């Protein structure tokens, strides 16, 4: 996401520290204001005894996963990157112990209309806090209940030095908000697929009556009211899986790429159609069918392509929605992405927002003084149907 103005900063490091500082100052002032308002209103019904809502899950519920030594016998195995070798050795492992749970999340007299399932990482505290305060607020929109969950693994190896602090911070969040689902697998790119699988299982067990689900990353901006307007004319018992449609995406064969998939994992020429993993919407009907289909589809290291494989297995197809933009909003002949709020007022979801951008956009779109002409509307999404790196 391009920055609104950065020419005054000669050093990227200086700019980064400046933006972080500004964000923290703004957040502090805003949170103090929000706290004063909540205190003046008195207890809020949705913040009910969260100590009883969250649950620290015992590790012994799932047997430990053991590496499959036969993977070493695959042709060319020793030439593969270490991360791909590990993926192949543990590809059969589909269930991991749950460290934090929120089983009563969907309990209550009112059914859940929309569940926001946000893929996050232990170190992304600032993103989670912004989402809680902006588009991810748990509330009722004209009687339609919206709830929120963050899907998290454990700190990856590069975060080992501060893993205890991140674990303590996540524990505080889980107890305070009751919105954290954490499993005991390393939170890496190749393990994003595990978050989808565990979410499907969790939903079936704890929230089977949810009408719709939004799966997204923690660096997206969601116009929640627009999402609800779209969903209110959909049926939860009909198939819905919509987002930025990717058709004809081919596997990346360069071993240095983040999206590298060798023939040992996928020998095919192109992936089945899927929606970019930055964000997509699905119905209760589709959640059930995906869960059943996933049992017959081997794990795959690219999470959104894996969902396309499960859809194909279930005999379903993804669809395109022009209001979901995983590649941002860009004006013609302009190099950087636009942050004009008028370009976002009719969209549902846009990918790649820094925390400070998320806060500013939320405030701008909810400013009663905002006036936009009919011409100030984002055009068609940028072509991404043939881009395998668009995730």
From Swiss-Prot:
Membrane topology: Single-pass type II membrane protein
Gene Ontology BP annotations: protein glycosylation
Reactions performed catalytically: a 3-O-[N-acetyl-alpha-D-galactosaminyl]-L-threonyl-[protein] + UDP-N-acetyl-alpha-D-glucosamine = a 3-O-[N-acetyl-beta-D-glucosaminyl-(1->3)-N-acetyl-alpha-D-galactosaminyl]-L-threonyl-[protein] + UDP + H(+); a 3-O-[N-acetyl-alpha-D-galactosaminyl]-L-seryl-[protein] + UDP-N-acetyl-alpha-D-glucosamine = 3-O-[N-acetyl-beta-D-glucosaminyl-(1->3)-N-acetyl-alpha-D-galactosaminyl]-L-seryl-[protein] + UDP + H(+)
Entry-linked InterPro entries: Glyco_trans_31
Sites carrying sugar chains: 68, 191
Keyword list, A-Z: Glycoprotein, Glycosyltransferase, Golgi apparatus, Membrane, Signal-anchor, Transferase, Transmembrane, Transmembrane helix
Gene Ontology molecular function, alphabetical: acetylgalactosaminyl-O-glycosyl-glycoprotein beta-1,3-N-acetylglucosaminyltransferase activity; galactosyltransferase activity
Transmembrane segments: 12-32
Domain of life: Eukaryota
Subcellular location, record wording: Golgi apparatus membrane
Cytoplasmic topological segments: 1-11
Enzyme Commission number: 2.4.1.147
Job of this protein: Beta-1,3-N-acetylglucosaminyltransferase that synthesizes the core 3 structure of the O-glycan, an important precursor in the biosynthesis of mucin-type glycoproteins. Plays an important role in the synthesis of mucin-type O-glycans in digestive organs.
Protein name in UniProt: Acetylgalactosaminyl-O-glycosyl-glycoprotein beta-1,3-N-acetylglucosaminyltransferase
């Amino acid at each position: 996401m391009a920055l609104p103005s950065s020419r005054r900063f000669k050093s990227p490091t200086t700019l980064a520290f400046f933006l972080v500082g500004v964000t923290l100052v703004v957040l502090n002032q805003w949170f103090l204001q929000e706290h004063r308002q909540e205190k003046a209103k008195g207890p809020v019904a949705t913040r009910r005894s969260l100590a009883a809502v969250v649950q620290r899950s015992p590790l012994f519920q799932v047997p430990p996963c053991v590496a499959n030594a036969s993977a070493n016998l695959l042709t060319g195995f020793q030439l593969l990157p270490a991360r791909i070798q590990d993926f192949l050795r543990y590809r059969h492992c589909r269930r991991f112990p749950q460290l934090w749970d929120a089983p009563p999340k969907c309990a209550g007299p009112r059914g859940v209309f929309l569940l926001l399932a946000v893929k996050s990482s232990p170190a992304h505290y600032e993103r989670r806090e912004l989402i809680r305060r902006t588009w991810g607020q748990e509330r009722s929109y004209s009687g339609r209940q919206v709830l929120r969950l963050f899907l998290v693994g454990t700190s990856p190896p590069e975060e080992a030095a501060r893993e205890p602090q991140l674990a303590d911070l996540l524990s505080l969040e889980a107890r305070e908000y009751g919105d954290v689902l954490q499993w005991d697998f390393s939170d890496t790119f190749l393990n994003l697929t595990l978050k989808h699988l565990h979410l499907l299982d969790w939903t079936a067990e704890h929230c089977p009556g949810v009408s719709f689900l939004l799966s997204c990353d923690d660096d997206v901006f969601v116009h929640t009211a627009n999402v609800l307007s779209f969903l209110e004319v959909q049926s939860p018992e009909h198939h819905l899986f919509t987002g930025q449609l990717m058709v004809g995406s081919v596997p990346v064969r360069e071993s240095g790429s983040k999206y590298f998939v060798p023939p040992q994992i996928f020998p095919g020429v192109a992936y089945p159609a899927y929606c970019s993993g930055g964000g997509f919407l699905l119905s209760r009907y589709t959640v059930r069918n995906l869960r059943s289909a996933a049992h017959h589809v081997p794990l795959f290291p690219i999470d959104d392509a894996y969902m396309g494989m499960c859809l194909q297995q279930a005999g379903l197809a993804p669809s395109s929605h022009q209001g979901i933009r995983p590649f941002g909003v860009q004006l013609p002949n302009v190099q950087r992405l636009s942050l004009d709020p008028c370009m976002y007022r009719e969209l549902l979801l846009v990918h790649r927002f820094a925390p400070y951008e998320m806060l500013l956009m939320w405030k701008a779109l909810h400013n009663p003084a905002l006036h936009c002409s009919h011409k100030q509307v984002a055009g068609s999404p940028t072509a991404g149907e043939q881009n395998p790196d668009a995730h």
